[in-house]
Amino acid sequence: MGIKYSSKINKIRTFALSLIFVGVIVMYLGLFFRTSPIIMTLFMVLGLLFLVASGIVYFWIGTLSTRAVQVVCPSCGKVTKMLGRVDLCMFCREPLTLDRELEGKEFDEKYNKKRKN
């Protein structure tokens, strides 16, 4: 079984969503320390920081998403956004590229790394 890829925008959104869950869980763990207000406050503040970080990531991916190149997927025909030289369709996971050199090659996220000259 091969590596399961996802579009870059969806990966970043998933990361931001996981930050929300981590923040809520950390705040919930703080409730177990109700007898110690200092420890409980630390957990609550740490959880709040995770939630704020999530908001920052969501804002960042939103601004990045507005600048992403929109292409029509040849497989499903839906408009999807591309970041980098290669990306996947958000809907059907079809490998997409705007680089003529990479057409027909096996999909690999390494193509998005900057080349050292």
From Swiss-Prot:
Domain of life assignment: Bacteria
Subcellular location: Cell membrane
Keyword field: Cell membrane, Membrane, Transmembrane, Transmembrane helix
InterPro entries hit by this protein: UPF0295 (IPR020912)
Gene Ontology CC: plasma membrane
Topology term for the membrane: Multi-pass membrane protein
Family: Belongs to the UPF0295 family.
Protein name, entry field: UPF0295 protein GTNG_0491
Source species of the chain: Geobacillus thermodenitrificans (strain NG80-2)
